[in-house]
UniProtKB/Swiss-Prot annotation:
Protein name in UniProt: Probable malate:quinone oxidoreductase
InterPro entries linked: FAD/NAD-bd_sf, MQO
EC number: 1.1.5.4
Pathway where it operates: Carbohydrate metabolism; tricarboxylic acid cycle; oxaloacetate from (S)-malate (quinone route): step 1/1
Keywords from the UniProt entry: FAD, Flavoprotein, Oxidoreductase, Tricarboxylic acid cycle
Amino acid sequence: MKKVTAMLFSMAVGLNAVSMAAKAKASEEQETDVLLIGGGIMSATLGTYLRELEPEWSMTMVERLEGVAQESSNGWNNAGTGHSALMELNYTPQNADGSISIEKAVAINEAFQISRQFWAHQVERGVLRTPRSFINTVPHMSFVWGEDNVNFLRARYAALQQSSLFRGMRYSEDHAQIKEWAPLVMEGRDPQQKVAATRTEIGTDVNYGEITRQLIASLQKKSNFSLQLSSEVRALKRNDDNTWTVTVADLKNGTAQNIRAKFVFIGAGGAALKLLQESGIPEAKDYAGFPVGGQFLVSENPDVVNHHLAKVYGKASVGAPPMSVPHIDTRVLDGKRVVLFGPFATFSTKFLKNGSLWDLMSSTTTSNVMPMMHVGLDNFDLVKYLVSQVMLSEEDRFEALKEYYPQAKKEDWRLWQAGQRVQIIKRDAEKGGVLRLGTEVVSDQQGTIAALLGASPGASTAAPIMLDLLEKVFGDRVSSPQWQATLKAIVPSYGRKLNGDVAATERELQYTSEVLGLKYDKPQAADSTPKPQFKPQPVQKEVADIAL
């Protein structure tokens, strides 16, 4: 009994010592101009902008894991697509009269051109090195079957020809031509099946994890930048002078410190919502989050990998979220080509792949519980879809693969759990709450703290998203001649649209392709694909979209 008592006393003394050490360390404040929470591509991109705009500003980045780019930015945890709406059919919804709306597709493509310019500029500065290590040319294709879907794709193709951003896209309903583009997709397919495809040669596969690592490595070369790994934010408190005191725990030794920052960016992926709530700013009360995970089938068999060089996206079935459609993609990961098929939706209450099962519950508050309930009630089809995905068997996933790869063999594929995506739920005056696809910058009125919520298109538009953030929280500086000149050096098309300007579009694509080592041939005249005859479509209930 004495030994047990002594042991318990010793443990109590030890825990008390750790607590005292933490308090002592927390009293030693570190000061910084900018605190970046999260070691992913968003923080890395914002830090890189600010390094050029205000090189004298001090910056501190804190990351909970033992390395940067280990969550959603990691190449294995996302689809690696340079989202530019060349093939993603959910960005071109069909109107009731059968016509195709291209506004969202144009906006997505414009955004990706900004990312390309940003990366090209960093290559020229020596910040990013060896472009092939993070971006490669992979043709983007849309592929559909069935008469209705073929009619849709034909109409989509015709509509996109109105934009200078989509010049060079090709369309075919010929089995032989499509087989030449994507042999793996066509071999073994019923020759009588009605199919159609579009193909754009300038599509890309992007390793966002590699971009993140290289950007942060460059930031670390400056003495006024500090990276703290295995460091978790435990508290955020606004000070009287509108600076922030952020308590950060060292997960390795149990100590803590306070960081006093003039500006805080929460770029923590799925954890951003909880940290935004922790800040106490009133703007956070409008938001909730719902986590959805993704799985991919992966093949590294050379017989499969060498037979496929494209990202091939299909069309979602009726009642499924538009972005849920699987796609079969060439990827370049860890220096080698692989093929991924998916994603298949999974459910976990974690907000991060390396998160806690309590994440969903701990982010639910009296302010956002009702919007969450409204979203659940209003989107029964989405709930049904997620349940059906969670219930998929190995055989079900393989049958889905065979729709895109008829001659697939089970032994060539393994299942991989990718990252978590926290969907935005926002309070809505009419509906109570709505599920929003996309990303959203949330900041306080003073512009001292900002968070990025949401998931799609995410990393591929990190550069324009962070530009939006700069305009939102540093508006006066952005309008200054100094910042304007620097931003236009980083992004040559900053402040103007490429869409509708053929010469400007070709100039920027030529420039970024040369610097990034990507394929680009000046588009020829559009082919003679028959113009679609629009047919009225039955009005269907809109299905909320999600990012996987």
